[in-house]
């Protein structure tokens, strides 16, 4: 055999063990750095959530104490709401005198139901909501109030919420706040309409 054929026939020499050891060390180091990067990113996300929660003032213990959702009225409460017969003469007389009409809503849309958007007919039975005096067809407002407890026009809650501490109803709170001096008011009597929310 010739010298050149001897070199071609032999396999390449195995790499030295130092090169293999350096490659495995590099893989271990890179995987450790990747794990550390994932851990730092997770901690940063948790810290950011905690910081935002503290800035917005959300207390995890108070989350369970949120007010109940706006559910509908019970049949007994629904039947207790006043009904009236619509008369066009009463609504036009009240509009001419600029007086609040007891048989219809707030003057600008007093001749139509805000739910079905049809005008009231003479002699038609309407239901008047007690807190805001908005008027609606009985069938329309009854269907609305079985799933929600607020006025469709002004979104005012119709169910009075009673304070556990003093027994006052939130529906009468606005009139009491205006009449009482500030040092006699109970904190449950304040509403968001009276006191603006604090914005940082």
UniProtKB/Swiss-Prot annotation:
It comes from the Eukaryota. GO terms for biological process: defense response; protein monoubiquitination. It holds the Pfam family zf-RING_2. Keywords: Membrane, Metal-binding, Plant defense, Transferase, Transmembrane, Transmembrane helix, Ubl conjugation pathway, Zinc, Zinc-finger. It is found in: Membrane. It catalyses: S-ubiquitinyl-[E2 ubiquitin-conjugating enzyme]-L-cysteine + [acceptor protein]-L-lysine = [E2 ubiquitin-conjugating enzyme]-L-cysteine + N(6)-ubiquitinyl-[acceptor protein]-L-lysine. GO terms for molecular function: ubiquitin protein ligase activity; zinc ion binding. GO terms for cellular component: membrane. PROSITE patterns: ZF_RING_2 (PS50089). It is a single-pass membrane protein. The keyword NAD does not apply. Its EC number is 2.3.2.27. PANTHER family: E3 UBIQUITIN-PROTEIN LIGASE ATL45-RELATED, RING-H2 FINGER PROTEIN ATL61-RELATED-RELATED. Interacts with BIK1. E3 ubiquitin-protein ligase that possess E3 ubiquitin ligase activity in vitro and mediates protein monoubiquitination. Triggers the monoubiquitination of phosphorylated BIK1 in response to pathogen-associated molecular pattern (PAMP) detection. May be involved in the early steps of the plant defense signaling pathway. Belongs to the RING-type zinc finger family. ATL subfamily. This is Probable E3 ubiquitin-protein ligase ATL45. It comes from Arabidopsis thaliana.
């Amino acid at each position: 055999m010739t010298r050149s054929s001897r070199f071609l026939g032999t396999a390449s020499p195995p790499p030295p063990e130092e090169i293999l050891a350096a490659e495995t060390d590099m893989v271990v180091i890179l995987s450790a750095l990747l794990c550390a990067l994932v851990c730092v990113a997770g901690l940063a996300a948790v810290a950011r959530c905690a910081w935002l929660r503290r800035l917005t003032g959300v207390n995890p213990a108070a989350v369970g104490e949120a007010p109940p959702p706006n559910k509908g009225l019970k049949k007994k409460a629904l039947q207790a709401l006043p009904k009236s017969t619509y008369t066009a003469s009463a609504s036009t007389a009240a509009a001419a005198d600029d007086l609040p009409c007891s048989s219809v809503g707030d003057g600008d849309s007093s001749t139509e139901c805000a739910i079905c958007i049809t005008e009231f007919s003479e002699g038609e039975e309407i239901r008047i909501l007690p807190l805001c005096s908005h008027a609606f067809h009985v069938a329309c407002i009854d269907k609305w109030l079985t799933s929600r407890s607020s006025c469709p026009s002004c979104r005012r809650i119709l169910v009075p919420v009673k304070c556990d501490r003093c027994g006052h109803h939130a529906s009468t709170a606005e009139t009491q706040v205006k009449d009482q001096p500030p040092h006699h008011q109970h904190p449950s009597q304040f509403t968001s309409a009276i006191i603006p929310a604090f914005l940082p």
